[in-house]
């Protein structure tokens, strides 16, 4: 059985548990292990002398089902190979398998969140809309990772990515 780890974020500690399951296990939606940088690596990359501030080491993403949150940090350098690898970090089947452990007869909240280049996008819905949520998450992840820093700023100032309004209407 996987071990539950409390998150460092106060809200996460109050409302949910973080499951640090191994990649490809039956309990996690992710196929790849967490690749969080060490504190030393993070400091070196984000030092004051660093010339390229828009070159993050990677991105964070999470899936949550009710109060259980699965998180991963994945390396991403913007190359085609890195994009292909990042897009394969989870699949419809792995999300459905992880969700099935927590979905009962009642409706619970399901959420996908991705943070990249200082921008965070969250998509959520009820467990009955999970399949549509997965489709939106796939499109959102692909779009967000392919945006340039200027395009990320533009999308943030517009409020939400294209298509989320229709999803909200369908899930209500």
From Swiss-Prot:
Belongs to the tombusvirus protein p19 family. Homodimer. The keyword Electron transport does not apply. Transmembrane segments: none annotated. InterPro entries: Tombusvirus_p19 (IPR004905), VP19_sf (IPR036131). GO terms for molecular function: RNA binding. It comes from the Viruses. The keyword RNA-binding applies. Viral suppressor of RNA silencing which binds specifically to silencing RNAs (siRNAs). Acts as a molecular caliper to specifically select siRNAs based on the length of the duplex region of the RNA. It holds the Pfam family Tombus_P19. Residues 153-172 are annotated as: Disordered. GO terms for biological process: symbiont-mediated suppression of host innate immune response. Keywords: Host-virus interaction, Inhibition of host innate immune response by virus, RNA-binding, Suppressor of RNA silencing, Viral immunoevasion. This is RNA silencing suppressor p19. Coiled coil: none annotated.
């Amino acid at each position: 059985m996987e071990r539950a780890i409390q998150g460092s974020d106060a809200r996460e500690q109050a409302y949910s548990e973080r499951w640090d399951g191994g990649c490809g296990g039956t309990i996690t939606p992710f196929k790849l292990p967490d690749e969080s940088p060490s504190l030393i690596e993070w400091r070196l990359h984000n030092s004051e002398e660093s010339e390229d501030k828009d070159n993050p080491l990677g991105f964070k993403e999470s899936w949550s089902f009710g109060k259980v949150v699965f998180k991963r940090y994945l390396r991403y350098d913007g190359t085609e190979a890195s994009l292909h690898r990042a897009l394969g970090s989870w699949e419809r089947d792995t999300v459905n398998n992880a969700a099935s452990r927590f979905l009962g007869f009642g409706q619970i909240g399901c959420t996908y969140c991705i943070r990249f280049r200082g921008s965070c996008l969250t998509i959520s819905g009820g467990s009955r809309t999970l399949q549509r949520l997965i489709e939106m998450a796939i499109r959102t992840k692909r779009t967000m990772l392919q945006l340039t820093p200027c395009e990320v700023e533009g999308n943030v100032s517009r409020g939400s990515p294209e298509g989320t309004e229709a999803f909200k209407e369908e899930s209500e």
